[in-house]
Amino acid sequence: MEKLLGYRDLNMTPREIVEELDRHIIGQKHAKRAVANALRSRWRRKQVAEPLRSEITPKNILMIGPTGVGKTEIARRLAKLAEAPFIKVEATKFTEVGYVGRDVDSIIRDLVETSIKLEKNRAKERVKSKAREAALERVLDVLVPRKKQTAWTGEEEIDPARKMYRERILREEMNDTVIEIETNQSMSANVEIMTPPGMEEMSSQLSEMFKSFGREKKTKRKMTIAKALIQLAEEEAEALVSHEEIKSAAIDNAEQNGIVFIDEIDKVARRSDVGGADVSREGVQRDLLPLVEGCTISTKYGMIKTDHILFIASGAFHLAKPSDLIPELQGRLPVRVELDALTADDFKRILTEPDASLIKQYTALFATEQLHLEFTEDGINKIAEIAYHVNKTTENIGARRLHTLIERLTDSLSFDAADRRDGDRVIIDAAYVEKTLGEISNNEDLSRFIL
């Protein structure tokens, strides 16, 4: 069944999941273990026979830690690893039902949209070779119209010209040749419905209604063969996939494998020392409760049960405490993990160890201009020390501080890169970092505004 639906039956042990997360995220061992156990529990649940399987619910997680330490990245990487529908929302964007603002049910609708897109891409990937072949035939029909069937065999004659053009197109020798092709264009393609905040569902319903009224018509367009192949392959793939199967698979994938990450949950916790009514706090928690407990939400694709969706809530909890959340919601977030603030050593590892570390990214970017950046060990240590120092003396924004520092560090290089000689080498050592960032980092007032 799962193979038919297209999503992965992830049979990785928690240890293997943590090792995979270690390739992208530094530290936060406890948080990684918690999400790895949650993902493995999903696999275990699938091995249990019904009716007990449907009674086993996911153990939702509450992550507590300052901004920029990896809370969102852990959840995002986990979803990517499982190839599961994933959505990140901010609790502060939602208000209690009856007030102006987004309704919490839209979280599940957005999750289903993500799942539909995921399943559609998978379905198109499965028919990719057929679609490309059909697109190639349509391009060849423009260049060399098909010959009629022979009277004796009823088969098409093999046209040498058609065969020659096919080989040239496959060798990409005709990519820039301009041809005129017929493409599909829906009558409602350019209709966009604008609705007030909180009424996105009405917008999608109206769009669907106009789409059903609109009919597809053929339009002739001139484009290069390279672009024509892409456009026509997309059309052919759209025709080859079964939209009913995609919808069914997407709903099942969202229900069984969906991951919802609710950020800034602490901002809707009602602090005990603050009185008065607060629409965006306790009311939002009470509206979130049915989703987390398990309920059925109506979407344009059908009814979605949230019983087995994994919810990961996170917050810094600087002013509020986890105990300030309503007791019912606390009970639905049984796994608590506290993430550590980043040290100077963590910053150093973040700069160098991940598969797509910042240093690798910037080195690759400048290499496109034939400018070779070399970060020395003392230079990396200095950047890490400054990041830690600025976070400590101003606002702690975690690893995001490194983006600001390196952007500042490479600002003049980025501006002048195109004017430099090819093959230039720039060594970024401790002296270079001190010269560029030292004065700003030591001046607290400047740090607040610039770094």
Curated annotation (Swiss-Prot):
PANTHER family in the record: ATP-DEPENDENT CLP PROTEASE ATP-BINDING SUBUNIT CLPX-LIKE, MITOCHONDRIAL-RELATED, ATP-DEPENDENT PROTEASE ATPASE SUBUNIT HSLU
SUPFAM superfamilies xrefs: P-loop containing nucleoside triphosphate hydrolases
Predominant location: cytoplasm
GO BP, sorted A to Z: protein unfolding; proteolysis involved in protein catabolic process
Organism expressing this protein natively: Dichelobacter nodosus (strain VCS1703A)
Cellular component, GO, one term: HslUV protease complex
NCBIfam families xref list: hslU, PRK05201.1
Lineage: Bacteria, Pseudomonadati, Pseudomonadota, Gammaproteobacteria, Cardiobacteriales
Annotated InterPro entries: AAA+_ATPase (IPR003593), ATP-dep_Clp_protease_ClpX (IPR050052), ATPase_AAA_core (IPR003959), Clp_ATPase_C (IPR019489), HslU (IPR004491), P-loop_NTPase (IPR027417)
Protein name from the UniProt record: ATP-dependent protease ATPase subunit HslU
Compartments in which it is found: Cytoplasm
Alphabetical UniProt keywords: ATP-binding, Chaperone, Cytoplasm, Nucleotide-binding, Stress response
Gene from which the chain derives: hslU
